């Protein structure tokens, strides 16, 4: 049991320096970024998703392209997302962008996580009436059980990582 605990501890902290750096650059909570990485890839920088997502934060081509363009990075290609630093920078930038779309709400992070997971078009469909500004109503309006679970699991894991600085 002690060996399992030690291995999990090492894995849990394997990307801390990269996470802290990206969080600092994009003025984001490192505990949130780490929780997203935990949920997306369990800290595996070579993780591959079913529809082309890559790396720690499971970034897709479109998101990576937006990040590279916004940051003035030329000659960027999707394969570079296997690089942990590039992946976490792109993912953190993209999550910040998603959260920024929802500043008018009581909890922009909830809406941003839904957008990161399910896409902006779904969030726009779910955020009508009370759900437009009330995160509890918004979560209830989400039609995908996996997206609801995604948001709640990241919230719980974020609390576990709260001391990351």
Where are the predicted features?
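Surface-exposed patches in mature extracellular/periplasmic domains of secreted proteins
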Residues: 32-34, 76, 103-114
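Substrate-binding/active-site groove segments that recognize
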Residues: 51-74, 90-94, 133
């Amino acid at each position: 049991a002690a060996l399992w605990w030690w291995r999990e501890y090492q894995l849990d902290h394997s990307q801390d320096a990269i996470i802290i750096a990206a969080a600092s650059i994009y003025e984001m909570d490192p505990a949130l970024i780490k929780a997203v990485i935990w949920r997306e890839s369990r800290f595996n920088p070579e993780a591959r998703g079913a529809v082309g997502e890559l790396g720690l934060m499971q970034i897709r081509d479109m998101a990576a392209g937006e990040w590279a363009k916004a940051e003035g990075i030329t000659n960027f290609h999707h394969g570079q997302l296997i690089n942990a630093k590039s992946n976490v920078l792109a993912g953190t930038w993209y999550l910040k962008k998603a959260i920024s779309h929802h500043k008018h709400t009581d909890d922009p992070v909830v809406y941003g996580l839904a957008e990161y997971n399910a896409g902006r078009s779904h969030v726009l469909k779910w955020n009508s009436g009370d759900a437009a500004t009330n995160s509890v109503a918004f979560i209830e309006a989400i039609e995908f059980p996996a997206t609801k679970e995604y948001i709640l699991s990241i919230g719980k894991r974020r609390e576990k990582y709260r001391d990351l600085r």
